[in-house]
Amino acid sequence: RRVLFRSNESYFMFRNEFCEQEIYLIENKISCAAPAFILCSADIHLHRKARLCRLSRMGALSQGRMLRVMRIKITIELSEKRFPADYRRAFLHLMKNALSTYMNGIYFQDFFPEGRPQRKEYAFAVGLPQGSACRGEYFDLGKNGIVATLTTGNPTYYILLYNAFRRLKGKQQLFMKGVSGRVASVRPASQPPVQNDKILVDFMSPLCVREHVDRKDRYFSVEEPDFYEQVRRVVSYQLTEKDWITDGMLEGFRIYPHQMGKTVARFYTEQLECSLGSAVLCGEPRLLQELYDNGIGSRCSAGFGVFRILTT
C-alpha cells in the first residue's frame, strides 16, 4: 500500500482497543467542508470497538479534551545493560534502518536528503535510565532498556515514522560489539496544545546553539554571556521559512533559564557544549507550539532540543 498525502485542514484517526496496528492514510469521502483523509489501521473495520478521534492541526478531541498526538514513544529492549556512549548516533542508525526498509525505502530521502544540509521537521531525544554512568565507549545503564521520543509537527512525517518503526518491531539490531536490541513497543504520546504565551519546560535532550562562521562551528551554553541572543538568533533562523511567522513573533520570543546548566554532549567525533535543565519560554503560543513539535535550537534532527512542558 502507498501512503497518500493529506491536503486539507483536518483528518481522522481510528484507534483499535485490542492491539496496536499500522497506520495508513487512505482517501475517503466524508461529509465535511473539504475533502478529507482517514488514518486507519489495515483491518480496523473488522473490530466493533474501534474508536474515532477527530484530529486537526490543533490536535485530537478525546473525551472532550483537546490533545495533540504528534510524538512517538519507542521502547528498545537490549541484550545487555549497556548502550553506546554516542547514543544519538546509535538511534540515528536505527532510524535509518527503519526508513530504508519501510516501503522499500521510498521515503528515506525525505528524512535524510542528499546534498546541502537543510532544516528537518522532526527531532528526537534518547532517554537513558536514571543513574546511568558513562564507562568510556558505553553507558552502564543498570537496566536493559531505553526509551526514545520522536517528535514532529508534520502529520505525514508522523505517520511515516510511526509505520517505519512499527515494521521494525521485534527485529534484532546491533548497536555495538556484544550489545544488540529490538524495538519492543511503538506508541503515540499526547500533550495538550500550547495556549499560553509562557511555558515552563524541561529539556529531554540538550539545547544545542551553534554559530557557523568561516567554516568553523562555535557552540554556546547557558554559561556564555550572549547565550540569550544566540538562542533567539537560532530560533529566528529555524523558523524563517514558516510563512506565518512575523517579525513581531520573533522579536517577542524569550528564554529564561530556570534550573539549567552547561553539559557536554558527544556526537560522532565532536564534543558539543550545550545546555540542559529547565527554562521558561515566552512568546506567541503558535511559535512555542512549533518549537515543541519540531525542537528548538541547532541539530534537532540529530537528537537535540526536545523538551517536555511542565506547566502552561
Please describe what each predicted stretch is:
Residues Y11, N16, Y24, N28, ...:
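Intrinsic-disorder-associated, low-complexity terminal segments enriched in Asp/Asn/His/Tyr and depleted
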Residues Y24, F37-C40, L61-T312:
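RNA-interacting cores
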Residues I44, R48-V69:
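Short, Lys/Arg-enriched N-terminal segments with co-localized hydrophobic residues
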